[in-house]
């Protein structure tokens, strides 16, 4: 069962400039930075302290087509059993964006479904 909102993914053009902004202007700390398994997408997770708060995920390389106001890519719900969430979504006939659960190099696992208005919802396991 999903436990809380884990992070919000924001698509960015320049991940280094965005990290600097979130650190220097907003006072956030870089918690993790990885290259996706596809070798193209760069991800950075930022938060305020070492507590279990909702984080910001910066995403570079997903799409070069960003509107001037930026783009929220998805919301992520934290789970401690990603396989059970996947099975539940299948049983509920959810529209899947991912055909399988993806495991990132740092061990994080995720998959996406669409909400009723096309919004992307990620189930995420740390």
Swiss-Prot record:
Record key words, sorted: Lyase, Metal-binding
Pfam families: Glyoxalase
VOC domain ranges (all copies): 4-126
Keyword Metal-binding assigned: yes
Amino-acid positions noted as binding a divalent metal cation in the UniProt annotation, renumbered to this chain: 7, 42, 74, 122
Biological processes, Gene Ontology terms: L-methylmalonyl-CoA metabolic process
UniProt cross-references to CDD domains, sorted A to Z: VOC
Record InterPro entries: Glyas_Bleomycin-R_OHBP_Dase (IPR029068), Glyas_Fos-R_dOase_dom (IPR004360), Glyoxalase_1_CS (IPR018146), MMCE/EMCE_epimerase (IPR051785), VOC (IPR037523)
Keyword Zinc: no
An example molecular function term from Gene Ontology annotations: methylmalonyl-CoA epimerase activity
Family, similarity comment: Belongs to the glyoxalase I family.
Name this polypeptide is given: Uncharacterized protein YwbC
Organism: Bacillus subtilis (strain 168)
Lineage: Bacteria, Bacillati, Bacillota, Bacilli, Bacillales
């Amino acid at each position: 069962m999903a436990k809380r909102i884990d992070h919000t993914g924001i698509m960015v053009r320049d991940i280094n400039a965005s990290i600097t902004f979130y650190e220097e202007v907003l006072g956030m700390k870089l918690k993790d930075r990885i290259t996706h398994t596809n070798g193209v997408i760069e991800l950075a997770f930022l938060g305020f302290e070492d507590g279990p708060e909702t984080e910001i995920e910066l995403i570079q390389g997903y799409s070069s087509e960003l509107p001037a106001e930026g783009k929220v890519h998805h919301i992520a719900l934290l789970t401690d059993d990603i396989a059970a969430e996947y099975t539940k979504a299948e049983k509920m006939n959810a529209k899947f964006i991912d055909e399988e659960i993806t495991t990132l190099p740092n061990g994080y696992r995720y998959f996406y479904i669409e909400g009723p208005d096309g919004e992307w919802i990620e189930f995420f396991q740390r």
